[in-house]
């Protein structure tokens, strides 16, 4: 997903207006259109703004469906 420089640069079709030219009920429910709504103009609180990658957190679980117990837990470093 690419980030845009402002709300005026958002070009996700259907995000700007609905079929009647209004903005009511867009992105409702949130789960139905999370990708279309996730840009700098609107981002739900439960979705992270950024992700950090931790190397080797899944080194012991090559197949997460079978080896899910071996997935590592990542804790942030204390400051």
Swiss-Prot record:
This is Quinohemoprotein amine dehydrogenase subunit gamma. It comes from the Bacteria. Catalyzes the oxidative deamination of a wide range of aliphatic monoamines and diamines. The physiological electron acceptor is an azurin-like blue protein. Inhibited by various carbonyl reagents, such as p-nitrophenylhydrazine (pNPH), 2,4-dinitrophenylhydrazine, semicarbazide and hydroxylamine. There is a cross-link at residues 7-16 (4-cysteinyl-glutamic acid (Cys-Glu)). GO terms for molecular function: aliphatic amine dehydrogenase activity. There is a cross-link at residues 37-43 (4'-cysteinyl-tryptophylquinone (Cys-Trp)). It is found in: Periplasm. Its cofactor is cysteine tryptophylquinone residue. Pfam families: QH-AmDH_gamma (PF08992). Optimum pH is around 8.0 for n-butylamine oxidation. The cysteine tryptophylquinone (CTQ) is generated by oxidation of the indole ring of a tryptophan residue to form tryptophylquinone, followed by covalent cross-linking with a cysteine residue.
């Amino acid at each position: 997903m690419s980030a845009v420089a402002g709300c005026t640069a958002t070009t996700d079709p259907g995000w700007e207006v609905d079929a009647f030219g209004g903005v009511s009920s867009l992105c409702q429910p949130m789960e139905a259109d999370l990708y279309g709504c996730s840009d700098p103009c609107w981002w739900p609180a439960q979705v992270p703004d950024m992700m950090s990658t931790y190397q080797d957190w899944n080194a012991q679980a090559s197949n997460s469906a079978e080896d899910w117990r071996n997935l590592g837990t990542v804790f942030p470093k204390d400051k």
